[in-house]
């Protein structure tokens, strides 16, 4: 996985203060498997993908499907273990702790942006 990034919402608010990026074959396949929880403010951006599953996971998640410009296409709230969600034409999926979409006010059509956690970049 690459260095974590910060995801910023349409209104400039921090949506995910520590977002890991899974963009390799192994990291995309592994996703959040093996973790017992996902802390508030943390997330996993999987790219490229248009579908996710929660097989073998131990907790529910919110999934935000994004296009290539980071515009929200679909929300899958409180996706429990052993479920799947997809959105055709999505470029990536942001996995957050269950309830984060509602808490942060994320909605379809919102445009996200990212910033590096590395001050040298």
Q: Which stretches of residues belong to each language-model region?
A:
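Compact, glycine-rich, soluble single-domain proteins
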Residues: 1-121
């Amino acid at each position: 996985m690459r260095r974590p990034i910060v995801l910023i919402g349409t209104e400039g608010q921090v949506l995910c203060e520590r977002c890991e990026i899974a963009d390799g074959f192994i990291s995309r396949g592994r996703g959040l498997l093996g973790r017992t929880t996902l802390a508030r403010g943390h997330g996993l951006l999987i790219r490229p993908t248009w579908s996710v599953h929660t097989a073998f996971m131990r907790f529910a998640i919110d999934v935000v499907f994004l296009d290539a410009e980071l515009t929200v296409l679909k929300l899958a709230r409180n996706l429990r273990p052993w479920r799947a969600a997809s959105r055709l034409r999505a470029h990536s999926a942001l996995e957050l702790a269950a309830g984060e979409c509602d808490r942060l006010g994320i909605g379809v059509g919102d445009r996200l942006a990212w910033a590096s956690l590395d001050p040298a970049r």
